[in-house]
């Protein structure tokens, strides 16, 4: 290679997820149940307001989870980022429901049922989601939760978000989304 062709190039890597089993205490289970319920409630409230707004004006109103915190004060008890991610999920559901590339239009997104899978996603902001001593995972508004850390991420991987889910048998899992910081390599 000639010296004029050598240089640094920035490469961004893909995300990677690792799923861990977690063992919450009774208090943490109650907080998880509250968060699951609040996420479902906010999703259904926002969906209702969007449908009613569309039917009355022909346009979808811009709704946010904070609009409901005065009427439903218990929403302040749970992680605000989990509620913000509910808004993102609803936007994605509307994009998919009205995407013209599909052969048929499915109409409005469906409401979340209490029988549906319990899960929520929270973002990592300045270390709010972290693996501690290879025994615990710190989660916003929950605290340190005992976990089975069977696979470690490399040090150059940073936690981007975490999705907490409860299976039908009552077991809890956390899926940690990792993002590698961009690297500069010599080419």
Residue ranges: model-predicted function:
Residues 1-187:
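Nucleic-acid substrate recognition interfaces
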